[in-house]
Regions:
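ATP/NTP phosphate-donor binding region
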Residues: 1-67, 78, 115
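Nucleotide donor/acceptor-binding cores
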Residues: 5, 91, 271
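Catalytic core of DAGKc-family lipid kinases
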Residues: 34, 43, 82-207
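Glycine-rich phosphate/pyrophosphate-binding beta-alpha loops
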Residues: 153, 157, 210-224, 292
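ATP/nucleoside-binding phosphotransfer catalytic cores, i.e., glycine-rich phosphate-binding loops
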Residues: 196-203, 223, 228-229, 238-313
Length: 313
């Protein structure tokens, strides 16, 4: 007989552009088949899931189920830590995908449909995965740090997420692809110094710097198709500067992962990545798990087996 785990469910009703709120009765019914007793809290503001998760774990919770997209899961994962220490190293994260972006679940083989996700919650064990920690400069210019689960990237990706957020505030169409296209049309590659472990990359202009723990980002783009959540290494994918016409010709490769063979793309594996703008360069935006939070300079550190998650590798 399986042990009954003290369970907390954290729901972001605004995820999936509000569809989670509409689907909640269906999701709740599915959860009842998985577990009879659990506490539930709905988030009402950004970063609230961090506080809920942290408080719940301090109260002895053993399983936190996140209902939302990658941003919601990122917040919950940050709540598993108090500074640099896990609050309860034996507690696990369960996932019910319900967001505009559910890229992490692809690396964990969690179906996006409700029945499949519930089956994983019921049948999958709690597996240890690596996580990332990034120290960066906040939008207010202060030193900050945050954990991430899937992918953190700087350059074009940070600009795209800012455009997505801007359009949402203006209640305009904010699909990732539309925002990517509009951003590429005006984006200029940046001069960045990059160091991976003990190796300094040649100084160059970079369009994308993706520090990948998982395989997929940007609503399904296979940025690091060979990445693994438990190999103890980041897959750092560095895309050098391209003219607009060149990117339009080659950018489709990101969808199926074939970009790694292109001459302006480098893949380097390592446990620590440091990225610093060249002097005089304009601010370079950083995003992690689909949330734009600050700028370079930044240091990305891999935390081996930093979190237990219900899923399959």
């Amino acid at each position: 007989m399986r042990k009954r785990l003290k369970t907390q469910v954290i729901v972001n009703p605004a995820s999936a552009k509000g569809e989670t709120r509409k689907r909640w009765s269906q999701i709740r019914e599915g959860l009842r088949h998985f577990i009879q007793e659990y506490k539930i809290e709905f988030t009402e503001r950004p970063f609230q899931a961090i506080d809920i998760a942290r408080s719940s774990l301090r109260d002895g919770t053993e399983l936190i189920i996140g209902v939302g997209g990658d941003g919601t899961l990122n917040e919950i994962a940050n709540g598993f830590y108090d500074g640099e220490k896990p609050i309860n190293a034996d507690a696990a994260l369960g996932i019910v995908p319900s967001g505009s972006g559910c890229d992490l679940t692809r690396s964990l083989n969690i179906p996006v449909h409700l029945k499949g996700a519930m089956t994983v919650l019921q049948d999958a064990g709690s597996i240890p995965i690596d996580i990332g920690k990034v120290s960066y400069q906040s939008t207010e210019g202060q030193e900050a740090s945050r954990y991430f689960l899937n992918v953190a990237d700087f350059g074009l990706g940070g600009e795209v997420i800012r455009e997505v957020n801007r359009r949402r505030l203006e209640r305009r169409a904010s699909s990732y692809v539309k925002c990517l296209i509009s951003t590429v049309l005006r984006y200029r590659s940046k001069k960045i110094r990059v160091r991976i472990d003990d190796c300094d990359l040649p100084r160059d202009e970079y369009m994308i710097g993706a520090i990948a723990n998982g395989r997929v980002f940007g609503k399904g783009m296979k940025i690091a198709p060979q990445a693994s959540l438990d190999d103890g290494l980041f897959d750092a994918v560095m895309v050098k500067g391209m003219k607009l016409v060149e990117f339009c010709r080659q950018g489709w490769r990101l969808i199926n992962g074939s970009h790694l063979t292109y001459r302006k793309v480098d893949l380097i594996r390592g446990r620590q990545v440091e990225a610093v703008p060249e002097e005089g360069e304009e601010p370079i935006l950083l995003e992690m798990d689909g949330e734009q939070l600050g700028t370079l300079p930044a240091v990305f550190e891999l935390i081996p087996r930093g979190l237990l998650v219900k899923g399959y590798l």
